[in-house]
């Protein structure tokens, strides 16, 4: 019986707190969000704090433009949706795995055959003396030999295991 009496006392105390919080939010005229967003923010104050921990604005501004536009801060700090991506500096080279060779048509062998003359041009395209050309060709041959040796060693090591990994 005492527990039910304590619970009834706690409920009236908690409801005025909610009523006191709501007028404070309604008094801010700078709020750019709609009234529906305000009511949902009041109801999920705990969820907001957890969202802020996992998704800080500094790390993901382009992914959360709606949040940035709805916040209570001066308009010069808010990022408009249109300019969020335009302000980025374009990359000089695409990241690994994305490049012209991915966009070109044809099979892997065709693309490889097209790229091979580029490597030949490294030696023959330059104005080198005969000695320099011979040295460059020797270096390429040595690289091929070492590569083949490593491939053979890898194949032997892989084949000599009694059980596959």
From Swiss-Prot:
Pfam families: BEX. The keyword Transcription applies. GO terms for cellular component: nucleus. This is Transcription elongation factor A protein-like 1. Residues 1-66, 89-124 are annotated as: Disordered. Residues 101-124 have a biased composition (Basic and acidic residues). It is found in: Nucleus. Belongs to the TFS-II family. TFA subfamily. The keyword Transcription applies. It comes from Rattus norvegicus (Rat). Keywords: Nucleus, Transcription, Transcription regulation. May be involved in transcriptional regulation. Modulates various viral and cellular promoters in a promoter context-dependent manner. Does not bind DNA directly. Residues 33-60 have a biased composition (Acidic residues). Signal peptide: none annotated.
